[in-house]
Amino acid sequence: MKRKSRILIGTAIVVVALLVALFLARKQFVGGPGSPTVEGSRAVTDGGIKIPGWNGRVDAAEERAGMTLDAARLVQEGQALHVTTGPATSYWKTDAIASGDFTVKATFTEPKYMNLNSHPHPYGVFIGGNDMGTPNQTELYCAASGNGKFIVRGFGPKPFSMTGLLSESNAAIHKAAGRGQPVTQDISLAVRGDKVVCSINGSSVASYDKTTLVGPGKLTSTNGYYGLRFAHNTDVFVSLLASSTK
């Protein structure tokens, strides 16, 4: 009996030692260029926001894993914005505010589908941004990936999903011909009266009553900042970001 107890105690000590070693190794390397986080994010080199007037925030889970805005990159290249993540990040301009009835849209081009990840990662636009840059930040985003699927999710400030746990397929969403091939999506979010509609490549893919999006645990309002949303480990060019009352 004593021998069995000693074996159990010894095994427990070994397990605890391994867990401590793994924790310390993770703590040492998380956040540096090329390092992983709990969600598999890999920090980019020469990161940060390189365009005046732009702001950003990485997801709370990424922050807890040691990631910062310097682990992702936003730069201007010609007429397009070039975003490389890194941690899952939201970007917005200081003066990008929309209220009432409006449409926010942008064109996203992934020049080499899945070149930074092992599975499709989405990108898109967000609206309803409030308390920006703080732990209470709220937003609703519609994002697509190059496998013909999309998600509608948000922060209130904790994450919430309007499309369930998994992404949804829709024939309107473009599919890349293969890994490393280009794919482009036109993505918009529109507020019209009591409805909020996500459209991709000119077709409505999701529509919600505003009352299901605003309230405790969700948006403060559909009014607020608008901007761009990227999952972790993406490499995307963005053009024609705009808000209109049409």
PLM region spans:
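N-terminal Sec-pathway targeting helices
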Residues: K2-V15
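Hydrophobic single-pass membrane-insertion segments
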Residues: A21-P33
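Extracellular carbohydrate-recognition regions
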Residues: G32-L69
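Short carbohydrate-recognition loop motifs
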Residues: D70-S90
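Secretory/extracellular carbohydrate-interaction modules
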Residues: T84-S161
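Carbohydrate-binding surfaces in secreted/extracellular proteins
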Residues: A106, R179-L213
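Short, aromatic/His-centered strand-loop micro-motif at the edge of beta-sheets
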Residues: P159-D186
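Flexible glycan-contacting loops in extracellular carbohydrate-active proteins
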Residues: Y208-V236
